[in-house]
A protein has these predicted regions:
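Bacterial Sec-dependent N-terminal signal peptides
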Residues: 1-23
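Carbohydrate-interacting regions of secretory-pathway proteins
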Residues: 17-260
Length: 260
C-alpha cells in the first residue's frame, strides 16, 4: 500500500504538468504588451498600443519604413505545435497576418523571411486592387494573385489558397480565427468565424513543391531582404508567433493558445 501511494505521488506532478501545458492560455495580460515584443526592437520601434485588452497596430504611429525594417509583434515564447484563437478586425483596404516559426536572428530583416503567414486582408480588394492600403506594391500583389487566391484571406500566403474561400465580416467588424499548427501530424488548418476555410500540410513533397513554385524560392531576387533572402523560410518548426505590421490599423483581442 505504501509503495502504491509513493508511486502515485511521483506520477501526479508529471500528469499535472502535461495537463497544464495543454490548457488554453490567455496571451493578453494586464491590459499590456506583457509577454510580447516588437521584432528586433532596440527601444526605438513603435506602432503598438493596448486599449481594453485589445492590441492595436497603427502604421501612422510606427517609426518604421516597412521596406527597410519591421515593427511586427512577436511572442516572447517560442512555440512548436499549437492551436491559437483570436479575434481581429482591420480598416477598409487593410492587411495584416499571423505568422509562426519566426526567427529573430539579426541576419534577417523581416519576420516573413522565416515565418509562414496566414493572410488577413479586406477581400473586397480583390475586386478593386487599388483600394488596398500600401500603394502600388500591395495592389500589384493582388493583381498577380487574382486567379490563384494564394494571398486571399485565410491563405498560407503565397503557398496554399483557401479551399473554401470566405470573405468574413467587413472592415470595422470583428472576425474570429482558430488556427492549428500541428507538426507531429503534419497538419495545419484555418477556421474563420466557425467555418473551415483552409487545410494544409506543413512539410513533405506537397509543401516543398508549392514553396518551389512561389516567391520563397526566388532568392536571387528581393535585394531589399539582404543577403539571406528567403533561405531561412519555414526551416524552423519551432519559433515565435507573430502579428504583422502593415499599412493601416489592425486590432487583435481574445488571443488564446493551447500547445499540442
Amino acid at each position: 500500500m505504501k509503495k502504491i501511494l509513493f508511486l502515485s505521488l511521483l506520477i501526479l506532478p508529471f500528469t499535472g504538468c502535461k495537463t497544464n501545458n495543454s490548457e488554453w492560455k490567455n496571451l493578453i495580460l494586464n491590459n499590456s504588451l506583457e509577454g510580447w515584443h516588437i521584432f528586433q526592437d532596440d527601444g526605438t520601434k513603435s506602432g503598438w498600443t493596448v486599449e481594453n485588452d485589445v492590441f492595436i497596430f497603427d502604421a501612422k504611429m510606427s517609426s518604421e519604413n516597412m521596406l527597410v525594417s519591421d515593427a511586427s509583434l512577436l511572442s516572447n515564447k517560442k512555440y512548436l505545435s499549437f492551436e491559437i484563437k483570436f479575434d481581429w478586425k482591420i480598416e477598409k483596404g487593410g492587411n495584416s497576418g499571423f505568422m509562426w516559426g519566426v526567427s529573430e536572428d539579426d541576419k534577417y530583416k523581416f519576420p516573413y523571411q522565416t515565418g509562414p503567414e496566414i493572410q488577413i486582408l479586406e477581400t473586397k480588394t480583390y475586386s478593386n486592387p487599388k483600394s488596398i492600403l500600401g500603394g502600388e506594391i500591395e495592389s500589384n500583389n493582388i493583381i498577380e494573385d487574382l486567379g490563384k487566391k494564394k494571398k486571399f484571406l485565410g491563405a498560407v500566403y503565397g503557398i496554399y489558397a483557401p479551399q473554401n474561400p470566405y470573405e468574413g465580416n467587413p472592415p470595422g467588424q470583428w472576425n474570429s480565427f482558430h488556427i492549428t499548427i500541428d507538426h507531429q501530424n503534419n497538419k495545419g488548418k484555418v477556421i474563420l468565424n466557425g467555418i473551415l476555410i483552409n487545410d494544409f500540410k506543413l512539410k513533405g513533397n506537397e509543401w516543398d513543391s508549392l514553396v518551389n513554385k512561389s516567391k520563397f524560392s526566388q532568392s536571387q531576387d528581393y535585394e531589399y531582404l539582404g543577403k539571406e533572402r528567403w533561405y531561412g523560410f519555414a526551416k524552423s518548426p519551432k519559433g515565435f508567433i507573430c502579428l504583422q505590421d502593415h499599412p493601416g490599423k489592425a486590432y487583435f483581442k481574445n488571443i488564446r493558445i493551447k500547445e499540442l
